[in-house]
Amino acid sequence: MTTEIGRRRFLSTGLKAAAGAAVAGPLLAACGSSASSGSGSKASTADDVLTIGLPITPQDSKQTLAYIDSFTKQTGIKVNAFTTNTATNTWVSVFQEISTRLAGGEPMDSAYIATEGMLLFEQRGVLDPLDPYIAKDQSAVNEFYSDVSPNMLANFRKLDDINGHTYFIPIGYNVMSIWYNRKVFSSLGLPDPTPGWTWDDFQNACAKITSGSSRLGFAIGTPVPGPFTDVYPWVLTNGGGILNADQTACTANSPQNIEAATFVRNLVTSKLVNQPGGSYNGFAAAAAGHLGMFGGGIWPNSGIPLTQAEVNQTFGIVPWPQKTQPGTPVGVGGFPIFKSSANKPALWEFIKFTISQEFQAGPVVNFGGDMPIRQSVAQSQSFLKNFPPGTESFSDELAYSTMIVGVPNGSAVETEISTAWEQILTGAASPSAGMQSMQDQVTQLMQQTV
């Protein structure tokens, strides 16, 4: 489906001007900091101005910029935000946009970067470690980490702490769950799905939703399927994985992965889902009752064309159906310190603000399309009451989630995973041949130096 998929795909429109904050368009040079190499030795002052890239949409800008204004009032540090939205609206294109700005010497202190790009930017040598800053505020960082899912934090530290250094502190996350139209389910006498439901349960629900109507049961990603949104949920819930545990080698051609690809291809041939390729607005179709289910994290909440009250009344959220085990990918995002920043102490103050209770309780969902990573916030009734039933599943799923991080030549790897999966869904390649092609191509790409 054509979606505004939050941490995986953004709207093409950028930030709108809002009172109290200066926001530049995506093609305008950001202003407010020097591109010279700063040592980070000077203390932050009220005269500091940070230039930071934010992946937020126009409808989210008012709340987000209000919290930036709160940061400025507390610290005296101003933030000039610019949009990292691009025409193609993928993380790959966002990383390219940021890289181009940095290579061109444009002033930029930081930008919100998803897990997939962390290794990429570290390997390019454009980041400063956070270690000395963390050491100075160890108690505050420890308090924050004590409020993060232990499983997710352990996986993050294992895979994203690079060469013994910390370059990111995660502030938000997303997993993959099923959003379902409760009104459609109820009208057909279908029970609400519950955690632990199976692939068979899912397929049977799709069949009933489509029977004798023009409705579709489920939406697959268009114009191309995404690895995080369309591939990983199916292979992980069958005990498979595109990469091995430490994500150093491709395992795409495993029997579990081929079985998962076969299952999704059967959904296509049975006409239970939209046809691959082209365009399909799953959020709009589901809102209108023309679609029973679609996959996502928390980000669809701001993309569904209904009021929040209508979203809460219409939809429910449940973990992904499983074949052999529960499973979901998880990705996080955070702010690094670019070497070119002349305002590093001030930027560290901003990073600390993003892990604070105040920030986590407010704009994280809107700001990056992510769940707040503090579990005291994400599991609180004051937070959950604002969203559809089942939102608590996002926190529950962290216990068995698989962290998806960047790999060598990551942009090309993600493109190949999408391409091979699409060929399977369209019937251009059999599931076994398609997954073998993915295996061969991804293995080759991961061995290339870029």
Residue ranges and their predicted role:
Residues T84-E97, W197-Q203, Q275-A287:
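Short helix-initiation/N-cap motifs at beta->coil->alpha
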Residues T51, D69, Q74, K78, ...:
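Extracytoplasmic/periplasmic substrate-recognition and gating elements
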Residues A205-T210, D246-P276:
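Glycine-centered hinge/linker elements that transmit conformational signals in sensory
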Residues V365-E416, Q423:
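Long, aromatic- and glycine/proline-rich binding clefts that accommodate carbohydrate-like moieties
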